[in-house]
């Protein structure tokens, strides 16, 4: 590891220096919390027996315009789902959700994860060891200068997060998800209709 000394510039006031010092301390956490600890993984799905709700058998792709999505979603949801943003660490109420149920795409409502695959990863984002079968697609992401595996809703293409190879058994994978990209449906409630 390289140590960097932060020395205030002669024209920099104390408040500005402390602000920059704070950002310098937080930046490594934000960059490493959702970074791979090993090579880029292949996607794995959870067995159908782990589903809590009955999944839709057929779901045609949902292709809405940017204007339509902006009207339906909050600014933060849109930024994460359709501009591949990342929410602040530990900001999602879903991080502490422990009830049995199904996590659905916040955009189109496609079921993506069973609560049975959710676990506490210590990263500050909701994490799962596998998605429901056939509900997410993946692609290569090199925006940070190295290769990661991005995953998104198979129906609307809404960005969910990235896959890393530091998860628990049985897959060894961690689906690091943005909480704003999901909605939770408890087991005793019906899944909402897919958005059209």
For each feature predicted by the language model, list its residue ranges:
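N-terminal secretory signal peptides and thylakoid transit peptides that target proteins
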Residues: 7-26
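C-terminal segment of N-terminal export signals and the immediately downstream linker at the start
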Residues: 33-76
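N-terminal post-signal-peptidase region of extra-cytosolic proteins
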Residues: 81-98
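Mid-length scaffold segments of soluble, non-membrane domains
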Residues: 95-127
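Residues immediately within or flanking Cys/His clusters that coordinate Zn2+
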Residues: 102, 150, 173
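Short cysteine-rich clusters marking metal-coordination/redox-active sites
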Residues: 105, 153-156
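Cys/His-coordinated zinc-binding microdomains
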Residues: 109, 157, 177-180
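Short, non-ligating residues that shape and space the ligands of small metal-coordination modules
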Residues: 114-115, 162-163, 185
């Amino acid at each position: 590891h390289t140590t960097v000394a932060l020395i205030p510039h002669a024209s920099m006031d104390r408040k500005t220096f402390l602000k920059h010092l704070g950002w310098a301390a937080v930046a490594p956490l934000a960059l490493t919390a959702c970074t791979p600890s090993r090579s880029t993984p292949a996607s794995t799905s959870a067995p159908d027996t782990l589903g809590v709700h009955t999944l839709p058998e057929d779901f045609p792709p949902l292709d809405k315009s940017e204007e339509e999505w902006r009207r339906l979603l909050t600014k933060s949801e849109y930024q994460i789902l359709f501009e591949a943003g990342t929410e602040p660490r530990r900001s999602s109420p879903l991080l502490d959700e422990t009830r049995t149920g199904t996590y659905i795409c916040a955009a189109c409502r496609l079921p993506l994860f069973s609560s049975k695959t959710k676990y506490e990863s210590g990263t500050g984002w909701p994490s799962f060891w596998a998605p429901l079968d056939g509900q997410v697609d993946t692609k290569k992401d090199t925006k940070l200068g190295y290769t990661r595996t991005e995953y998104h809703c198979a129906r609307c293409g809404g960005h969910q997060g990235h896959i890393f190879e530091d998860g628990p058994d049985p897959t060894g994978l961690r689906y690091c998800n943005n909480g704003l990209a999901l909605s939770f449906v408890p087991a005793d409630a019906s899944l909402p209709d897919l958005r059209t």
